[in-house]
């Protein structure tokens, strides 16, 4: 079983969910915890450079939670966003920056 670690952004979003949206997000995160890097489409997608996205519907939209894997069977969530064609490239770039910040911080310890 993989341990899911929430970034502040993802934790803030996740704790705001209720009802069916909370259930949908929890199901996908539980699946990620069980499958780890073996989780594939349509549930997860590899974006390159050790960056992945978890894919599901919540809040009546397609949601994405970006994440990476770390030592000790950890899944580190980075960002979350509403999937829209016009903002997808920008959001993936933002997730890559969050991943770089995480890796830099981890390297300092």
What role is predicted for each listed range?
Residues 64-66:
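Short acidic loop-to-beta-strand element that houses the catalytic metal-binding Asp/Glu
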Residues 1-62, 71-75, 81-109:
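Basic, Lys/Arg-enriched alpha-helical interface segments
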């Amino acid at each position: 079983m993989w341990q899911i670690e929430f970034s502040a952004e993802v934790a803030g979003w996740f704790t705001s969910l209720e009802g069916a949206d909370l259930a949908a997000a929890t199901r996908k995160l539980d699946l990620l915890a069980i499958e780890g890097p073996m989780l594939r489409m349509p549930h997860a997608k590899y974006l390159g450079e050790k960056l992945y996205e978890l894919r599901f519907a919540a809040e009546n939209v397609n949601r994405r939670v970006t994440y990476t894997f770390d030592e000790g069977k950890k899944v580190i969530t980075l960002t979350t966003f509403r999937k829209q064609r016009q903002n997808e490239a920008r959001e993936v770039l933002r997730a890559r920056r969050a991943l770089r910040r995480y890796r830099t911080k981890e390297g300092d310890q």
